[in-house]
């Protein structure tokens, strides 16, 4: 599923850009959509990318709280910006997107960490998302 892989990568890039610029991710998403419509060299933003970014935006506080709670030895502010946004995207998809198998979410997040972050990041991302996966039933119950 190369299309889903690309959609995740683009969603991560949108979250990363919003974090770096201090701008809401929905504003960045709108910019990307507008830019793709006005510049034929830019690929369109896929439905799945939009679903991931929009879904994340509805859960941003909860996701940041979970990452802060389970990231042993790291505060959200001290965490590398790349890792923080890979974790944000992975946590959203893991906990709230039922159609994607958990193993796929973890693998894709680790691949993003390998591509965009430090040598230590893949194991950090895998460990934290693995912990959230184990807690997923109780995390979703806490939402109700």
Question: What are the residue ranges of the model-derived segments?
Answer:
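N-terminal interaction/assembly modules
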Residues: 1-144
């Amino acid at each position: 599923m190369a299309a889903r892989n690309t959609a995740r990568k683009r969603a991560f890039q949108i979250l990363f850009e919003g974090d770096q610029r201090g701008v809401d991710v929905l504003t960045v998403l709108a910019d990307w959509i507008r830019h793709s419509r006005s510049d034929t060299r830019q690929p369109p933003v896929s439905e799945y990318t939009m679903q991931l970014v929009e879904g994340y935006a509805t859960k941003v506080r909860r996701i940041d709280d979970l990452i802060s709670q389970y990231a042993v030895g790291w505060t959200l502010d001290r965490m590398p910006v790349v890792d923080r946004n890979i974790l944000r995207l992975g946590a959203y998809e893991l906990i709230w997107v039922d159609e994607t198998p958990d193993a796929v979410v973890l693998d894709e997040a680790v691949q993003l960490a390998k591509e965009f972050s430090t040598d230590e990041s893949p194991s950090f991302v895998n460990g934290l998302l693995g912990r959230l996966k184990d807690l997923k039933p109780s995390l979703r119950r806490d939402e109700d």
